[in-house]
From Swiss-Prot:
Protein name: Fumarate hydratase class II
Organism, scientific name: Mesorhizobium japonicum (strain LMG 29417 / CECT 9101 / MAFF 303099)
Gene: fumC
Keywords assigned by UniProt, alphabetized: Cytoplasm, Lyase, Tricarboxylic acid cycle
Lineage: Bacteria, Pseudomonadati, Pseudomonadota, Alphaproteobacteria, Hyphomicrobiales
Annotated catalysed reactions: (S)-malate = fumarate + H2O
Note: There are 2 substrate-binding sites: the catalytic A site, and the non-catalytic B site that may play a role in the transfer of substrate or product between the active site and the solvent. Alternatively, the B site may bind allosteric effectors.
Length: 465
């Protein structure tokens, strides 16, 4: 007996053949043919989130006596398999589809319907006893389901991946700040010599940037935790029973362990995604901070003989195919590339967020994809940068001291005693003649050897006073 390679699925456009071993149905199959665009698939976190929505909706519909318990239980079980990632291979659709995410919502409805039918001993594609629209999509619309899945996926990834990764980086930078606090170095402003500080103080600034980034991102979570579910097509809640929105948000919170709530205004939740733009803005700010930190570290580690050479960075791999022995700041370069990608994602996401024409924003898959890519890249890069660079950074104290000793900006310590103009003249003369500050200061007769040695003490210039 020959096993059929396809089965016939139907929708309102008629029949279509689907691979027999695939759970998706007619609408997902049509999407595969209609949107042969790019290689970017719907993120696995969105697929998981759609499973969460479908499970929560089925549980609430059963509780409200709208869904037969046998059908509902099968939907819940099938949706849980989606949540667990067991059915990821059955979600083949690309990002570039209808802007409401309708095809992906129907992909979820069809997969869960067919898997539930299979669990109940029925025939896949028959839509009996579990219908993808009537049962799996009960009390829902793609217009509230996909935005809800967006918020679930983005919040979960921020909470479980990005914030822990940034904490990991902060801990390492803070440890370096404490380890380097005794090392006095010359500061630089406008890339030119400035007054001294400690290397630990410099690293404390990096640690503070990361800590502030975490706080700013956490401030945006309440917006992501507001869910559109229950607004259905245009925000009115048509075909969803009274109380469904609140109950389904409670179920989603219970399933995910994140304090999701129903959005107070469903018209805003469907037509605008300002909370996504706001949250990604904080992520973008974190990328700006990480770009600065990675840049500073690679410049401070430049050399080893002809650069600043204040830091020694871990040597992880050969750096050149032509120059033997060359080692490059590869982790810094990877981090800065990631940050540039996040900047680009922020521009795309900001524009997409502005396109809520009338009652619905139709850039949802793009917004979700860019947001989630930023979170994954920054999370991964933060861990990689920490483990393969930051923890192994060492100070080159001999180079740091040499640069400090020859800096002309130590003259700043004399200004309160001999005046700004006289101090500036000493610095310029020393630079012109190639002499030391001490020599030129004593030559002016404005300060004695004892006073110079008392006033120009780098260790006293790293704090107020």
């Amino acid at each position: 007996m020959t096993v059929a390679k396809t089965r016939t699925e139907t929708d309102t456009f008629g029949p279509i053949e689907v691979a027999a071993d695939r759970y998706w149905g007619a609408q997902a199959q049509r999407s595969l043919g209609n949107f042969k665009i790019g290689w970017e698939k719907q993120p696995a976190s969105i697929v998981r989130a759609l499973g969460v929505v479908k499970r929560a909706a089925a549980e609430v519909n059963m509780e409200m006596k709208r869904l037969d318990p046998v059908v509902g239980k099968a939907i819940v079980d099938a949706a849980q398999e989606v949540i667990d990632g067991k059915l990821n291979d059955h979600f083949p659709l690309v990002v570039w589809q209808t802007g409401s995410g309708t095809q992906s919502n129907m992909n979820a409805n069809e997969v869960i319907s067919n898997r539930a039918i299979e669990m109940l001993g029925g025939v896949m594609g028959s839509k009996k006893p579990v219908h993808p629209n009537d049962h799996v999509n009960m009390s829902q619309s793609s217009n509230d389901t996909y935005p809800t899945a967006m918020h679930i996926a983005c919040a979960e990834q921020v909470v479980h991946h990005l914030i822990p990764a940034l904490h990991h980086l902060h801990k390492a930078l803070d440890a370096k700040a404490r380890a380097f606090n005794h090392i006095i170095k010359i500061g630089r402003t406008h890339t030119q010599d400035a007054t001294p500080l400690t290397l630990g103080q410099e690293f404390s600034g990096y640690a503070a940037q990361v800590a502030s980034s975490i706080k700013r991102i956490e401030m945006t979570l309440p917006g992501l935790q507001e869910l559109a579910q229950g607004g259905t097509a245009v925000g009115t809640g048509l075909n969803a029973p009274v109380g469904f929105a609140e109950k389904v948000a409670d179920r989603i919170a219970a399933i995910t362990g994140i304090a999701f709530v129903t959005a107070p205004n469903k018209f805003e939740a469907l037509a605008a995604h300002d909370s996504m733009v706001f949250s990604h803005g904080a992520i973008n700010a974190a990328a700006a901070a990480l770009f600065k930190i990675a840049n500073d570290i690679r410049f401070l580690g430049s050399g080893p003989r002809s650069g600043l050479g204040e830091l020694s960075l871990p040597e992880n791999e050969p750096g050149s195919s032509i120059m033997p022995g060359k080692v490059n700041p590869t982790q810094c370069e990877a981090m800065t590339q990631v940050c540039v990608q996040v900047f680009g994602n922020n521009a795309a996401l900001t524009f997409a967020g502005s396109q809520g024409h009338f009652e619905l924003n139709v850039y949802n898959p793009l917004m979700a994809y860019n947001f989630l890519q930023s979170v994954q890249l920054l999370s991964d890069a933060s861990v990689s940068f920490t483990d393969n660079c930051v923890v192994g950074i060492e100070a080159r104290e001999d180079n740091i001291k040499a640069a400090l000793d020859r800096s002309l900006m130590l003259v700043t310590a004399l200004a309160p005693t001999i005046g700004y103009d006289n101090a500036a003249k000493i610095a310029k003369t020393a630079h012109k003649n190639g002499t030391t500050l001490r020599e030129e200061a004593l030559a002016t007769g404005l300060v004695s050897e004892v006073d110079y040695d008392r006033l120009v003490r780098p260790e006293d210039m790293t704090h107020p006073g």
